[in-house]
Each structure stands twice: as C-alpha cells, then as structure tokens.
Design a protein with these regions (language model features):
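C-terminal motif of bacterial Sec signal peptides marking the signal peptidase cleavage site
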Residues: 30-33
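Extracellular/periplasmic periplasmic-binding protein-like sensory domains
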Residues: 253-333, 412-416
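Extracytoplasmic "Venus flytrap"
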Residues: 36-73, 80, 93-100, 186-191, ...
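Short beta-strand elements at the ligand-binding edges of bilobed clamshell
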Residues: 94, 138, 147-172, 211-213, ...
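Beta-alpha junction/loop-to-helix N-cap segments that form part of ligand/metal-binding clefts
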Residues: 45, 62-68, 81-150, 216-219
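Extracellular/periplasmic Venus flytrap/periplasmic-binding protein
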Residues: 153-258
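Periplasmic-binding protein-like
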Residues: 109-122, 140-142, 180-184, 212, ...
C-alpha cells in the first residue's frame, strides 16, 4: 500500500543508558504550546515524568481531549498516592497538526527527561519517532494514525490504529451495502485509506470502493458530496473519513436535494461520535441509521464507568474532555497500561529502559473489558505485513438507532487477519 513501509525497525542490542528523572516543580515555566501538571501527593519514590501530545486549535483534526484526559488521570492517581508510590508528572504539548510541531513535542519530551510518551496523537510519525528512538523513549498507546506506530521497536499500541478501523469499516459495510463510495483526505496518510477499506470489503465479497479525494481543510463539500452520492447509487453507502471535517462533509451531504434513493452513510469513530449525532438532531438528524466502526465498546458500556468517574471528579469541568471520543478513550487505556507497567517495576526510579524491558517481557494489561488483555511480547504480535507491532486487531460494529450509538454486533470483531 502506498506510504506504508513493509518492514519493522530492528531493536538495537546496545543496553539503554539509565536516565535520572527531574523532580516536578510546581512553579515551573511552560514553553509555548506545552503544559505540565506536577505531581502533588508527595510520595517517597521518585516522580515519573511522561508526555501526552495532540493537535489543538489547528485547521484540521484536533484532539484536545487527549492531553486533558492525561491531566485528569494524573490528578486522580496523585490524589491516591501516585502509581506504586510514584507521583505522576504529566507534560502536555500542542502538536499543532504539523511536522514541525510533532518534532518539537518529541524534542521537548527528551529535554524534560520523560520516561514515555503516552496516549498521544500525531500524523507525523517520522518526525516524532526519530527523536524518541534516539533517546530510547517508548511511545505507549498512540492513537494509531501512522505507520511508525506499528513499525518502531519502541512503539506499544493499544489498538490496531486507523488500519483496523478502515478494514473493519469495509467488513461492516460489506454486510450492509451493495456498493461503497469513500471520501478521504487528499494527503499522504489518506492515500492508504482505500486499500485498507477495500481489504475489508473484499473479505465480505464486495468490490473496491470508489475513491473520492477531498481537501482536509475545506469549508464546503457540496461537489464532493454530490459525486459520492452518485457513485454509491441506490442500496449503497457513502463512508467519509476526514477527521474534524467529516462533520462539514456530512453537513454538505444532507443539504443535497432528496433524489429518493436509499443510501446509507458511514464513518469510523473519531470522525463521527455521539456528540456529533446529538448536535445534528439525534434521531431526526442525518446520522440516523449510520454505520460506524470503532476500536472499543460503545460509550454507554459499563466498562467505561471508571473513566467517567475520574472525569467527573478530576477534570474540573474541562470542556475539552468528551468521554465518548476515541481519542480521550485511547488516552485512558494508554495510562491504564502505564499504571500496570509502573506497578510491575519494583524500584524507586522509573526509566525509559525499565519501561520498555517490562513491556517486552510481557506485562499483562487488563483494561476491564475495553480491549482484550494487552501484551507486547514477540509472540503476541501476529506479524501483519506493514503493521508488525499490532497486538490488538479487534474492532466493534456500531450503528445509530433512535439517535444513540449502539452495538450493531455484540462484542469484538478481529480484523487483524483482514490486513494480512
């Protein structure tokens, strides 16, 4: 597939240099685009410094809920004595949806002696992984939008990334649609989307989707929406994966004159969510009946209750946090993994090397039913071509009914083999 390198990075054999963590200073100054939440519990062990980054306020995709969730998690952890006696110090950085921003955040993580980058989002894998690899800093629980997250020996993904969402979306649409038109960004990252969607369609004995490119930052998609509807035809589906501009696309789509044809709409979680369904009219809106593919259980699932309690108690009314957003959810799961790793290290000092060694040796992460049990040993990786670091190939099929996102199919669907 275009843009996805068919190899994995080879782990160097040199021993990692131990790094001494800087203690948190409550009055520390903040660099532009970055913040820090110091630990507050006064634990006897050294504090653990980590970073979470995501784009905020950019002209394309924005995920402010990820750093906001990281801060809330740290408040919760530190209020109860930290993680295994360690205060959790969270740095946040605005990646700005740019290659320069991604590189700046990674260099900031190195400078601040972060022991891991946790629960973050960036489309610029080469720019952020190079500095992290040079400093041997692990990348734990990234959103999964770049190839480096599934190739780098220092990446430990908690989901199957955009690849499994798109392959899963193809599987879901193959069950319900005679023909599919796909609207995706005209970017290098977007160039991979059709092949991934088509792999799922083929698994369901459907032909390839019609590939429709669109500007990632457009303010109107009327012409694109018209073409997509024409290509889908009656009995078909239009699926759009445009990040934050997915809402703009479907706003243009719903304004098209009714032509009497039965065409369903679709996307993947993170492009459409419960908040968007609510904003656009709920059961009487354009997303009623829409098919959606996600990584995790529906937001109403009881397994999310611990996260919701933390948000309610420690987010201090932070409007950036949406408990139904998969970015927020991914950050929660990534920090759950971090907690398990630190809990398995019986030492007063936590270093990047100790974290990676613990992950590589097979620490088990129980996410309470939000994912399968996660482990990152070599034998836990099925060796999917182009995505060798995937350990969780599961997705969920969801549908909008009566204005609510509900499970279309109970439980998880493993699409890892679809990518093979």
């Amino acid at each position: 597939m275009t843009g996805w390198r068919r190899f994995s990075s080879i782990r160097p054999f040199e021993a990692r240099t131990a790094r001494t963590l800087c203690t948190a200073v409550a009055g520390a100054s903040l660099l532009v685009g970055c913040g820090v939440l110091p630990g507050t519990s006064g634990g006897s062990k050294d504090p653990v410094t980590v970073m979470t980054w995501a784009p905020v306020g950019s002209n394309a995709t924005n995920l402010p809920g990820m750093p906001a969730m990281a801060k809330a998690y740290a408040r919760w952890a530190n209020a109860s004595g930290g993680i295994n006696g360690h205060d959790l110090r969270v740095l946040t950085c605005n990646e700005r949806n740019s290659s320069a921003g991604a590189a700046d955040c990674a260099r900031r993580a190195v400078k601040e002696k972060a022991v891991a980058v946790v629960g973050s989002y960036s489309q610029h894998g080469r720019e952020f992984m190079a500095p992290l690899e040079a400093a041997s800093i692990p990348y734990l629980g990234g959103y999964g939008i770049t190839e480096e997250e599934f190739n780098s020996y220092l990446s430990y993904p908690v989901n199957g990334g955009q690849a499994t969402l798109l392959a899963g979306n193809g599987r879901q649409l193959a069950r319900n649609c005679d023909r599919t038109a796909m609207v995706r960004p005209d970017t290098i990252t977007g160039d991979d989307f059709p092949d991934l969607l088509d792999s799922g369609l083929a698994q369901g004995r459907r032909g390839p989707a019609v590939d429709i490119r669109a500007a990632e930052d457009a303010s109107d998609y009327t012409r694109t929406a018209t073409r997509a509807r024409e290509q889908a035809r009656s009995g078909g589906c239009v699926t759009a994966v445009l990040g934050d501009r997915t809402e703009t696309f479907f706003d243009s789509y719903r304004r098209l004159p009714d032509d009497g044809r039965d065409i369903r709409v679709s996307s993947v979680l993170g492009n459409i969510g419960q908040a968007l369904v609510n904003r656009t009219g709920g059961r009487s809106g354009p997303f009623e009946g829409a098919y959606l593919t996600g990584w995790y259980p529906v937001a109403s699932d009881p397994a999310w209750q611990p996260m919701r309690k933390v948000i309610d108690t420690y987010a201090f009314g932070d409007n950036d946090i949406d408990a139904t957003d998969p970015g927020t959810q991914t950050t929660w799961i990534a920090y759950t993994a971090l907690r398990a790793v630190i809990g398995a290290i019986d030492d007063g000092e936590i270093t990047p090397g100790k974290i990676t060694d613990t992950l590589d040796r097979g620490v088990k992460v129980d996410t309470g039913g939000l994912t399968p049990t996660l482990r990152w040993r070599y034998e836990d990786m099925p060796g999917v071509p182009g995505f060798p670091r995937i350990v969780n190939g599961d997705v969920t099929f969801q549908v909008v009914r009566e204005g609510r996102l509900v499970a279309e199919k109970k439980g998880f669907v493993d699409v890892g083999h679809t990518l093979s």
